[in-house]
């Protein structure tokens, strides 16, 4: 089995259904003796260019280990799901264990927002 990094972009109106979609894709991979090594929900982010007149979309990254038949079925499900705007599959040499650069930036943004909220509540309490 080979290792792959799969990134897919979901329509922003379908953001509520992303967990169900991810669960379905995970079940597809693990059901055919594959493994999901890393799953990252990058959230709603700005697109580099408009896709179908949209400027924001929901990003999800999965690092998986599976066979070619499983990968073909996964790509087929991406292709025929209208909520998935784009997808990218990259073959990798091994499964990374550390968080990706994008996930680190998402965590930094969340920490920055949390500290700003804490500072705002502290000033409001004074």
From Swiss-Prot:
Homology family: Belongs to the bacterial ribosomal protein bS6 family.
What GO MF terms are annotated? small ribosomal subunit rRNA binding; structural constituent of ribosome
Task: Name the Pfam families on file.
Answer: Ribosomal_S6
| Name of this protein | Small ribosomal subunit protein bS6
Q: What is the lineage of its organism?
A: Bacteria, Pseudomonadati, Pseudomonadota, Betaproteobacteria, Burkholderiales
* Keyword entries, A-Z: Ribonucleoprotein, Ribosomal protein, RNA-binding, rRNA-binding
For this protein, the record's Gene3D superfamilies field holds: 3.30.70.60
The cysteines covalently paired via disulfide bonds are none
Relate the protein's function as given in its record.
Binds together with bS18 to 16S ribosomal RNA.
């Amino acid at each position: 089995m080979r290792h792959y990094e799969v990134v897919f972009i979901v329509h922003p109106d379908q953001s509520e259904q992303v967990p169900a979609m991810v669960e379905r894709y995970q079940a597809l991979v693990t059901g055919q003796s594959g493994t999901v090594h890393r799953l990252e929900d990058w959230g709603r982010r700005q697109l580099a260019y408009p896709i179908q007149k949209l400027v924001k979309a929901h990003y999800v990254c999965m690092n998986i280990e599976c066979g070619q038949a499983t990968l073909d079925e996964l790509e087929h499900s991406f292709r025929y799901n209208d909520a998935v705007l784009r997808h990218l599959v990259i073959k990798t040499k091994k499964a990374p264990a550390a968080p990706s650069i994008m996930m680190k930036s998402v965590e930094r943004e969340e920490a920055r927002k949390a500290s700003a909220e804490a500072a705002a509540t502290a000033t409001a309490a004074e």
